[in-house]
């Protein structure tokens, strides 16, 4: 095996000790000499594993409270030496080859995430020697093996056992990629953290006090690392290539973390639409169903159970529901699953959990993509990204949602209790409809959805048309608008359609005129003070 390289000497130095003792014992059993530092060396020695301190190997002690341990020619020369080329130099400088390095880095992310972390705390958790060894070993992957993830220990041991104590070039190259990904992510975290510390140009003798009292939410340069989950057949259109990347630091229930139980591979559009459906259904605590088509909800309802919620959501717009995405906020049962597959063609069904009986029902439609995303307790604070040509827009996720005690009735007429319940339901749906968004609802069920029109009044007209097409009664329905009404024409159109009350953010320079129009029609109007544009 021409590219095999034997492991005779290894350097182990890890902050996360998971699996390192077992790994060291396995290396020792194969005759590998072990070098180590600090806590890792003590752990091995305390458990009877022969180990040589790096300071003994180099003949130079650790200095500066451990800041300098492995930054030495006998370490990096041993790692970077090209086998078959640098032997004479190594002999002249008494450098011994180091064939394997297992390193993970100081816990910078965990440190800065702690409440009360100071800049000094962060600085002391910036690893220097570790990344240097990682990069050196990865650079020389032709001859040396680098491990930065504990889950690779068993893989390397198995390969050594199968190859007379050696690793293959294929494995070393794959591990080198992981190593460069690891150091890139690590440096990115550090750059992001420091980039939020904006100097106040103070002459204060204390460096830490010379930083602004409040950090900037957005660093000077933004670094992130996404991991490819899958290659996609094509992108939004068949002439576009695509792949799906995920943020491994987010553990919130999402399309990115969902497990596919059956069906064809998810497409680009499937993933985007499933995200829209799932994020919408998360807003509801009662059994709810959201049906999405082209990133817009076309039917949303709550019910006593999922079957009722699905039947009511489907009733809103059966035509658009064809080939749609269906999301639930509770365990999918067999009865609801049967109603779906018997009634309509569906691309994706996603729920926190899917019972075995429901799986068996959906299995009859082998192409249907069935996803289980897990329960969601809390939403993760994270950023939204929007790509523009030559740049990237970053913002907080829109996680805002007003409660009953936060809205303000601005009309003369007060909404009834039933109307207020429908208003809050309708407002949650409007948040996930493309702007300009108008949603009609009655009895916790959408009646019509007007999405993406350039004029708000035309979105209202579309919602009315959709309701009429399906024979749904608009009279005494409620209406939600994702942003304020600039003119009274939207109110007049709503009144003509039979809308009884409206929920909207308010904030127009013509608010008084808008409120007067509502009063003129005997409508109730509620302001939320919060807009939900969605583009």
From Swiss-Prot:
Q: Which HAMAP family match?
A: PurH
Q: Which organism is it from?
A: Shewanella woodyi (strain ATCC 51908 / MS32)
Name all MGS-like domain ranges: 1-148
The record's annotation in Pfam families points to: AICARFT_IMPCHas, MGS
**Pathway(s) this gene product operates in, as recorded in its UniProt entry:** Purine metabolism; IMP biosynthesis via de novo pathway; 5-formamido-1-(5-phospho-D-ribosyl)imidazole-4-carboxamide from 5-amino-1-(5-phospho-D-ribosyl)imidazole-4-carboxamide (10-formyl THF route): step 1/1; Purine metabolism; IMP biosynthesis via de novo pathway; IMP from 5-formamido-1-(5-phospho-D-ribosyl)imidazole-4-carboxamide: step 1/1
Report the domain remarks.
The IMP cyclohydrolase activity resides in the N-terminal region.
Family recorded in the similarity comment: Belongs to the PurH family.
State whether keyword Heme applies.
no
Question: From which residue to which does the signal peptide run?
Answer: none
Q: What is this protein called?
A: Bifunctional purine biosynthesis protein PurH
Q: Sorted alphabetically, which PANTHER family does this protein's record hold?
A: BIFUNCTIONAL PURINE BIOSYNTHESIS PROTEIN ATIC, BIFUNCTIONAL PURINE BIOSYNTHESIS PROTEIN PURH
């Amino acid at each position: 095996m021409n590219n095999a390289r034997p492991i005779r000497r290894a350097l182990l130095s890890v902050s996360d000790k998971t699996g390192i003792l077992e790994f060291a014992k396995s290396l020792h059993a194969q005759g590998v000499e072990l070098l180590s530092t600090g806590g890792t060396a003590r752990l091995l020695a305390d458990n009877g594993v022969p180990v040589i301190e790096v300071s003994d190997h180099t003949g130079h002690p650790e200095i500066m409270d451990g800041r300098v341990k492995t930054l030495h020619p006998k370490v990096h020369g041993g790692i970077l030496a090209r086998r078959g080329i640098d032997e004479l130099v190594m002999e002249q400088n008494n450098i011994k080859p180091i064939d394997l390095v297992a390193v993970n880095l100081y816990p910078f992310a965990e440190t800065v995430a702690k409440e009360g972390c100071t800049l000094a705390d962060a600085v002391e958790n910036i690893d220097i020697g570790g990344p240097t060894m990682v990069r050196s070993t990865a650079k020389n992957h032709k001859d040396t093996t680098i491990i930065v993830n504990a889950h690779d220990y068993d893989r390397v041991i198995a390969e050594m056992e199968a190859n007379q104590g050696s690793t293959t070039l294929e494995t070393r190259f794959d591990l080198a990629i992981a190593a460069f990904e690891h150091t890139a992510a690590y440096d990115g975290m550090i750059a992001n953290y420091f980039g939020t510390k904006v100097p106040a140009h103070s002459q204060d003798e204390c460096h830490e006090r010379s930083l602004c009292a409040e950090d900037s939410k957005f660093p000077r340069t933004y670094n992130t690392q996404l991991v490819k989950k899958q290659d996609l057949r094509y992108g939004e259109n068949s002439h576009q290539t695509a792949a799906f990347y995920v943020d491994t630091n987010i553990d919130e229930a999402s399309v990115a973390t969902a497990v596919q139980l059956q069906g064809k591979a998810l497409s680009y559009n499937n993933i985007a639409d499933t995200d829209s459906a799932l994020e919408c259904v998360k807003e509801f605590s009662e059994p709810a169903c959201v049906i999405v088509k082209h990133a817009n909800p076309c039917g949303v309802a709550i019910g006593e159970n999922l079957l009722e919620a699905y039947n009511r959501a489907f009733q809103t717009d059966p035509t658009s529901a064809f080939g749609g995405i269906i999301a639930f906020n509770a365990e999918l049962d067999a009865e609801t699953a049967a109603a779906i597959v018997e009634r309509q063609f569906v691309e994706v069904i996603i729920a926190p959990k899917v019972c075995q009986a429901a799986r068996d029902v959906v299995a009859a439609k082998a192409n249907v993509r069935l996803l289980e995303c897990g329960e969601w307790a809390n939403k993760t604070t994270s950023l939204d990204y929007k790509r523009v040509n030559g740049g990237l827009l970053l913002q907080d996720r829109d996680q805002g949602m007003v409660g009953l005690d936060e809205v303000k009735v601005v009309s003369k007429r007060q909404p009834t209790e039933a109307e207020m319940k429908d208003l809050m339901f309708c407002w949650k749906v409007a948040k996930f409809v493309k702007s300009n968004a108008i949603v009609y609802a009655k009895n916790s069920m959408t009646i019509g959805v007007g999405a993406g029109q350039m004029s708000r009044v035309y979105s209202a007209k579309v919602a009315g048309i959709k309701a009429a097409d399906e024979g749904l009664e608009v009279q005494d329905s409620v209406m939600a608008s994702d942003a304020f009404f600039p003119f009274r024409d939207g109110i007049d159109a709503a009144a003509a359609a039979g809308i009884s009350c409206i929920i909207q953010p308010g904030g127009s320079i013509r608010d008084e005129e808008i409120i007067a129009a509502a009063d003129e029609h005997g409508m109730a109007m509620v302001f939320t003070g919060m807009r939900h544009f969605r583009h």
